[in-house]
Structures are given as structure tokens and as C-alpha cells.
Amino acid sequence: MAEFANASHEVINVTLGTTLAATTKLVMPTPAKPILPVQTGVQAQQEEQSSGMTIFFSLLVLAICIILVHLLIKYRLHFLPESVAVVSLGIIMGAFIKIIEAQKLANWKEEEMFRPNMFFLLLLPPIIFESGYSLHKGNFFQNIGSITLFSVFGTAISAFIVGGGIYFLGQADVIYKLNMTDSFAFGSLISAVDPVATIAIFNALNVDPVLNMLVFGESILNDAVSIVLTNTAEGLTRENMSDVSGWQTFLQALGYFLKMFFGSAALGTLTGLISALVLKHIDLRKTPSLEFGMMIIFAYLPYGLAEGISLSGIMAILFSGIVMSHYTHHNLSPVTQILMQQTLRTVAFMCETCVFAFLGLSIFSFPHKFEMSFVIWCIVLVLFGRAVNIFPLSYLLNFFRDHKITPKMMFIMWFSGLRGAIPYALSLHLGLEPIEKRQLIGTTTIIIVLFTVLLLGGGTMPLIRLIGIEDSKARKRNKKDVNLSKTEKMGNTIESEHLSELTEGEYEAQYIKRQDLKGFMWLDAKYLNPFFTRRLTQEDLHHGRIQMKTLTNKWYEEVRQGPSGSEDDEQELL
């Protein structure tokens, strides 16, 4: 019995021990993942070297592009738009790098790759903010109804036509087969227009200001709408929609779009108004460096906040730029006004140049999947979708507009539907599976962008001259006097509406007592503008003029005392 009891006791102990061990094993917490990636010294050094080479390569490309733009201005090659020249240079550089890699002299494959995250976080926000900040708000708000109709409903029409056409052609085995959400995502991203070359030609030939603003205003809002539509399609792709009907899918997509559009616009507007109140009641005009720093913070703030709460940072930063230009800008000192305007233009120019250069480089930088039928049908659908967007909506708007959109203007608006950097970056950002689908979308997008920029952009000026839509004064000019350099125009001018200096009495006499102000313009002049902007006193104006005069004299003294200064140079400056 004793032996049996001992044996039983041992079995119980073993069983309990096994159970406790198993229990302990089950409840043992998993080790926490390291916050920072674990890297060896060699890996960290290699990553630093790769990042350094990427920065060097990007700056090298940018420097070469700046020299190219300078040569265009110096030798008055104004017939060639800068975007076309930079894309062409990128193609040449990409071919040169490909030859070097083939000879095994160097391998810059990692450095020449365009990273979509870098585009959306660093390059796109300054471009969008500057377009809103430098917007001619008078013409924009006078045509806000037409611009909104083209940019929102027109972009949606184009996206549905392109996406639906690709889907049904794929189901008919005419082209590569994509599912509904992938087709709509591609239709949305390829509907973003970027008429940089066209706007430059419009400015050079002095076309109708209404036509100029309709095309320019549509392109500004259209970019944000296209990004929101693409994000909507991506959101539907990530969710399991197999048990949801088509009508429910449409309602869900519509709700997501409305939330993104109006929520982001409201966030950007609110941020801009807060910045106006902050700089109105906190007087930083005597310290321009602090004032400028505060403006830069408020410029990027809505983008980060919107992205952090799952809204559209691009839409938020666009509306923030428009509001800050309309209210906050007038609370700044004259020095910071000029500094802000020129800094934004410089940064936007560098970002645009980087994007167009890497667009040309991308032809050789990643593997492509080319299908002739898919490319041809996509180009046809893009042109057809643009036509269905422009012509019916223009005829509809003419019932309500005093300044009618003529058939010639409609045709130019259709022809100016160039595609640019945003479709290219969005195509690389899509997480499509399998990989060949992503390569097909990327390759097709690059071909469409190059087709529209080089062919449509290059053919806009001959078309305008052919149909005679340019201003009569511009028609008398010699072709050599036509200037398509956006950089030269921006460098030679300061927007007069951004440097207005009005006292309280002058503002009341000029705006509030005007009888022709209606609707929002009257509300803005009567209540909003006085509430959000600082009305200057005569003492403030006097101090601002002294500050500008002091800085100008200081600059002139530094130039005159420079190592290459001479009497002839002084006479030239005078």
C-alpha cells in the first residue's frame, strides 16, 4: 500500500507539474516588439550610404534641371514649356543611366527610383498649397460654381467612364481584365488633370481670362477630388465587399467621398481662419523670422492633421492655402508677405521640377508591363471621358452664366486635359495584386502622361492660333515674343492683391460702401474680412515703409561693396 501511495503521489506530482508547466506556457506573455528596427552596424551604415546617395542624386537632377530652365530663359526659347523640357531631360538622363548600368560601371537603380511616399509627404503639399495661396481669388470666386461643377462632377464623370469602360472591355476579353474597384481606382487617378503647359500658353497669348480661370481653377480642385476618389476606391478594395450589393457599395463610396471632401475642406478652412486670428492678435511683424516660421507651421499643419485622422491632406492644405492667402496674408509685415510669396514659388518650382524629371527617369527605372490594346483603349477612354465631362456641363452652365462658354472655349478646355505628376504618383501608390497588374497600371499611366504632355501640350499653341481664340493684341505679336516660361513670369512679378495696404477708412471707402457687392462678396467685405484681418493705422503703414526702405538700402550697400562692384555696375543698378 505504501508503495502504491508513493507511486500515486509521484503520478499526481508529475501531472500537476505538467499541468502547471502547460498553464505557465499558455499565459506567458509574448515578448514586445522593438520600437526601433534592430540593425547591425553594417546595415545601418549601408542604409545611411543609400540614403545619402539618394539625396545626392535628387539634388544633382534638380541642379541640372535648374540650369536647363535658366538656359531656356537666357536664350529665349520661350516656345518650349518648362515641363516638357524637364520631362525630356529626365528621359535622356534615364537612358544615359541605363547605358552606364549595362556597362556595369555603376548601379543607381535604387537612387533613380521614384518613391510615392516621398511625393505625397514632401513634394505634393508645397505644390498644392502654393497653387491655392497664389490663386487670383477675384476671378476664382466669380466662377466658383462653374469650377466646382467641372472639378467635382466632371472628374467623377470622367472617372466612371474610364473605369467603367476598362471594366466592361476586360469582361469582354478585349483588354487586360481588372475587377470593378481596380478599374474605378485607375479611372479616378487618370482623371487628375495638370495643364501646366496649357496655362503657360494661356498667359503668353492673353486668352480670355474666363477660359484661363476655368481651366486653372478646375485643375486645382480636380487634383484633390481625384485623390479622394482614388482613396475611396482603395478603401473599397481593402474591405470585403462580396456580400454587399452594388447599390450599397455605391452609397458607401458616396458617403466616404462626401466625408473626405467636405471634412477635409472644413478642416483646411478652419485651420486657415485660426492662423488669421493668431497672427492678427499676436503681433509678430517686428520679428519677421518668427512671423515667417509661424506661417510655415500653419501651412503644413492641416496636411498632417488631416492625414492623421483619415481625411485628405491635399484637400485640407488646398483650402487652407486659399483662406490663408485671403485673410492671414494681410496680417503679415510687408517683408514677410514678399518672403512668403517668393519662398512658396521657389519650393513649388523645385518640387514640380523633381516630379517631372523623375517622371522622365521612370521610363527606365522599374520593370514595365506593356499591352498595346490596353494602352490604346485607355487613351481613347481618357479623351472620350474628358469630352463627356466638358461639353455637356458647359452647355448646362451656359443657361446660368452671363459670360457664355463658347464652342471654341469648350474645345480648348477639352484639349487642355493634360495628365501630370499626380496620376503618375498615384499609380505607383496603388497596392494592386498581383505585381503584374501594378506594373501594367504604372506603365500605362506613364504613357498617357507623356502622350498628353508632349503631344497635347505641344499642340496647344498651334491650335489656339488656328482657331483664333487668342486676344487681338497677342495676335499681333511676333512668335519670338511669346513667353512660356512660368519661372520667368513668377520671378518678375509680385501679386498686387497680396501687397495691399489699406487703413480702416480706405478699406471702408473702397469695399464696404460699394453697391455692386453681392452674396458672399458682400458678407466677406462687411463682416469676415474686418474680423479676421488687421486694419492698419497710418503709423503701421509708416513703419512698414521704413522697414522696406531700410532693407532695400542695406541690400544696395552690400551689392555696391561686393568684390565685383564698380561704378558701371552702380549706374546699371540705378
UniProtKB/Swiss-Prot annotation:
One of its GO terms (biological process) is regulation of intracellular pH. GO terms for molecular function: potassium:proton antiporter activity; sodium:proton antiporter activity. Keywords: Antiport, Golgi apparatus, Ion transport, Membrane, Sodium, Sodium transport, Transmembrane, Transmembrane helix, Transport. The chain crosses the membrane at residues 53-73, 77-97, 116-136, 149-169, 184-204, 254-274, 304-324, 347-367, 373-393, 410-430, 444-464. It is a multi-pass membrane protein. It is found in: Golgi apparatus membrane. Belongs to the monovalent cation:proton antiporter 1 (CPA1) transporter (TC 2.A.36) family. This is Sodium/hydrogen exchanger 8.
